A protein has these predicted regions:
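Beta-strand-loop-alpha-helix segment that lines the small-molecule cofactor/substrate pocket
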Residues: 1-4
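A short, polar/proline- and glycine-enriched secondary-structure boundary/capping micro-motif
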Residues: 111-116, 137-148
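Active-site loop of classical SDR/Rossmann-like NAD(P)-dependent oxidoreductases
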Residues: 148-159
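Predominantly a Rossmann-like dinucleotide-binding segment in NAD(P)-dependent oxidoreductases
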Residues: 6-78
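Short aromatic-enriched loop/helix-cap "lid" or pocket-rim segments at secondary-structure transitions
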Residues: 12-14, 38-43, 87, 114-115, ...
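Alpha-helical elements of Rossmann-like donor-binding domains used by nucleotide-donor carbohydrate transfer enzymes
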Residues: 10, 14-17, 63, 89, ...
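Contiguous beta-strand/loop segments that form the cofactor/metal-binding neighborhood of enzyme cores
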Residues: 55, 61-133, 158-169
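C-terminal helix-rich "cap/oligomerization" subdomain common to oxidoreductases
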Residues: 95, 160-193
């Protein structure tokens, strides 16, 4: 199993549950203030670390795919820095009409949160800040879900895998989705070359 842990985070699970009751297409805005890494760092080397989009950015493609609950129908991407391609804006279009933008940026301030997700659906908004604060705007019966410490779902992801192995159950992330995320992430990376 690929460790796409963010989909297992408790606040993401809450977002998914809330979206189940929101009719129509959704719009997702994922901002990742990833920070700069030198061009000669191993994560920037496509042969070793795969590059930052393949190495880390794919996690956010997975997160948006999970929340949309529909396959990715099309995608576009642009990058600021041609040398490292680590300040990227990606647009995803989903088969259900939902859209998502991923802003994976290496040129921001460390004073700004690293990961922020905004979801717009059915006249309502959800905002997840750094996997600590989830705030709802216009959601009947829901206004916030805050955690004492950040939880990006690593433990729940590992638990789901172990449980599947113990019980002989299916993969916690369907193989078709894993292959789709991998294919789309590679296509995005290749489109930036």
């Amino acid at each position: 199993m690929v460790g796409f842990n963010r989909r297992f985070a408790p606040q993401v699970q809450k977002v998914k549950a809330l979206l189940a009751g929101a009719p129509g297409p959704k719009a997702f805005v994922m901002t990742v203030n990833a920070g700069a890494i030198p061009a000669n760092h191993w994560t920037q080397d496509p042969a070793v670390g795969g590059g930052r989009l393949l190495g880390e950015g794919c996690h956010f493609v997975d997160l948006l795919r999970f929340l949309a609950g529909a396959p990715i129908a099309a995608h576009t991407a642009v990058a600021i820095d041609a040398a490292t391609r680590d300040s990227v804006s990606v647009t995803l279009m989903f088969e259900d009409g939902s859209i998502g933008t991923l802003h994976y940026l290496a040129n921001g301030s460390k004073a700004f949160p690293k990961e922020r997700l905004e979801v717009f659906a059915a006249g309502r908004v959800l905002q997840l800040d750094n996997f600590r604060r989830l705030t709802g705007f216009g959601w009947p019966g829901f206004s916030k879900l805050n955690l004492w410490q950040q939880d990006k779902g690593q433990h729940a992801c590992a638990q789901a895998f172990v449980q599947a192995v113990r019980t002989g159950g299916g993969s916690p992330i369907p193989l078709a989705e894993l292959l789709e995320i991998g294919r789309v992430s590679i296509e995005i990376e290749e489109s930036l070359r």
